[in-house]
Regions:
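Polytopic transmembrane helical bundles with strong interfacial aromatic enrichment
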Residues: 1-233
Length: 233
């Protein structure tokens, strides 16, 4: 799943490079530098702590296979939709930091990220909706919404995205709430990575916890701390 995360990160970076050509060069360069730092951090995590190509020793004669409750067509749609929503927020996280560095603010900054916020918000909303429908007909899952810790972790970035969308309208039309927009840009991706940490670390008991490892959770926690520290600076 982290490979998918990195692929989506890379795609968003490439699309930003192509689509945002009319914005200042320094702003675009700093956005891509920060985006590449994020990609590098997750690449290190995959290579040294969660390599999907590492061999299993001893080789099991018969593997356990996929968890039965995950053997559903909806599960081919639900996680990728959420991932696009989560990872899509990295673009405006990087853009917000680039905006502070280059002093590129106001309605022009709002216009540069508004469509990216709309895309990630739309995919996040669809991901939550598909997951809720699947949870409803999956026997014993608890209805449309279970208020499970991991479910709530996916909802928090959605709230931040929704607030950000409304704030961007004010910034674009009235040139107000710039610092509030910056905070929401940073907060959305931080909450997305926090959700990844909660799922991977096993720190919380959750019906969504299918693969967890405390050592992997520690790496993500360190990465998350560095992100927050870098954002504050």
């Amino acid at each position: 799943s982290l490979l998918l995360w990195i692929i989506i990160l890379t795609i968003f970076s490439f699309l930003f490079l192509i689509i945002n050509k009319h914005h200042p060069k320094n702003y675009r360069i700093y956005t891509l530098i920060i985006q590449n730092i994020l990609i590098l951090g997750f690449l290190f995590f995959v290579l040294f702590n969660s390599n999907p190509f590492s061999s299993i020793t001893p080789i099991p004669n018969e593997g356990l296979g996929l968890n039965p409750i995950l053997q559903d067509p909806a599960l081919a749609i639900h996680p990728p939709l959420l991932y696009v929503g989560f990872v899509g927020s990295s673009i405006y996280f990087s853009a917000a930091m680039a905006s502070i560095i280059t002093n590129y603010s106001g309605k022009f900054f709002s216009q540069s990220i508004k469509n990216w916020v709309l895309v990630s918000w739309s995919f996040q909303s669809l991901g939550i909706l598909v997951g809720s429908i699947w949870a409803y007909y999956e026997l014993g899952w608890g209805g449309f919404w279970f208020w499970d810790p991991v479910e709530n972790a996916s909802l928090l970035p959605w709230f931040a995205m929704t607030a950000l969308l409304h704030s961007l309208i004010v910034l674009e039309k009235r040139n107000l709430l710039y610092f509030w927009v910056i905070i929401l840009c940073l907060l959305t991706f931080i909450l997305s990575v926090t959700g990844t940490f909660l799922v991977r670390s096993g720190i919380l008991n959750s019906v969504h916890t299918f693969a967890n490892d405390p050592s992997r959770g520690l790496y993500i926690l360190i990465f998350l701390t560095l992100m927050i520290f870098g954002s504050v600076l």
